[in-house]
Amino acid sequence: MAGQPSHMPHGGSPNNLCHTPGPAHPPDPQRHPNALSFRCSLADFQIEKKIGRGQFSEVYKATCLLDRKTVALKKVQIFEMMDAKARQDCVKEIGLLKQLNHPNIIKYLDSFIEDNELNIVLELADAGDLSQMIKYFKKQKRLIPERTVWKYFVQLCSAVEHMHSRRVMHRDIKPANVFITATGIVKLGDLGLGRFFSSETTAAHSLVGTPYYMSPERIHENGYNFKSDIWSLGCLLYEMAALQSPFYGDKMNLFSLCQKIEQCDYPPLPGEHYSEKLRELVSMCIYPDPNQRPDIGYVHQVARQMHVWTSST
């Protein structure tokens, strides 16, 4: 969804978006495990235009007819093809995502199932993303100043720390999912739900796009954990400095990419342009053993210190 408007604040309540009165006795969620919301339906939205397309979903700019708020409406197209447990877990996870409330995270406002299709309502505002900024600097043949790197990275760390403190992993941190407003505010979006899709459903899509941010534990199918988000943060910090992924290579196949990732084989960042602290943090995050990577509290602390230091020099 690079180059598309992001799902970001455009007014509206941080609580459920649709405020139509519920029944006198709301349905018991235990008896309806797939029921996310009983208050919204597609009839409550006027869809204006498509603003993005993901691997498994489409995103539309829409207006909620109940309060006239402009939102992003994400329709998960393959929800009906997911197995029953994946559906239930996905619904549960979205419930957790709706509880996140942080200035650097795109807010999940509401969600509902209609015609066997999952619909997610998100905050929206027009903005660019980090991948666009990286492409711009690359085209200009200029490096991103270190103070700018820390200005955005510290906000991203704040968002991830909020998620991790609530035991929620992002699972898909990459430049295209880091949106930047016109006033320089970072908004982390597209919180990863892809793991809920069944292997049969996703098999044909698993190699769509080169997974440059894939961690060694994912290559070995050892499962995703909080330290996998740290690996992705390290890759993103590196890419902001080098203007390309640490494991990028021309004409590289998936096997050679996996080899480079397992060996942490990437070109060093230029010492004459970036501080030792930045280069050190990258190497700590892009580390093969997840248990040896720092936690988000440490990464955020370093980012705060460096943001203050580079802003004052």
Swiss-Prot record:
It catalyses: L-seryl-[protein] + ATP = O-phospho-L-seryl-[protein] + ADP + H(+); L-threonyl-[protein] + ATP = O-phospho-L-threonyl-[protein] + ADP + H(+). Binding to NEK9 stimulates its activity by releasing the autoinhibitory function of Tyr-108. Interacts with NEK9, predominantly in mitosis. Interacts with KIF11 (via C-terminus). Interacts with APBB1 (via WW domain). Interacts with ANKRA2, ATF4, ARHGAP33, CDC42, CIR1, PRAM1, PTN, PRDX3, PIN1, RAD26L, RBBP6, RPS7, RPS6KB1, STAT3 and TRIP4. Displays an autoinhibited conformation: Tyr-108 side chain points into the active site, interacts with the activation loop, and blocks the alphaC helix. The autoinhibitory conformation is released upon binding with NEK9. The active site is at D172 (proton acceptor). The keyword ATP-binding applies. Its cofactor is Mg(2+). It is found in: Cytoplasm; Nucleus; Nucleus speckle; Cytoplasm, Cytoskeleton, Microtubule organizing center, Centrosome. GO terms for biological process: apoptotic process; cell division; chromosome segregation; protein autophosphorylation; protein phosphorylation; regulation of mitotic metaphase/anaphase transition. Residues 45-310 form the Protein kinase domain. The record marks Y108 as: Autoinhibitory. Keywords: Apoptosis, ATP-binding, Cell cycle, Cell division, Chromosome partition, Cytoplasm, Cytoskeleton, Kinase, Magnesium, Metal-binding, Mitosis, Nucleotide-binding, Nucleus, Phosphoprotein, Serine/threonine-protein kinase, Transferase. The gene is NEK6. GO terms for cellular component: centriolar satellite; cytosol; nuclear speck; protein-containing complex; spindle pole. It comes from the Eukaryota. Residues 267-270 are annotated as: Interaction with APBB1. The modification Phosphoserine is found at S37, S206. One of its GO terms (molecular function) is ubiquitin protein ligase binding. This is Serine/threonine-protein kinase Nek6.
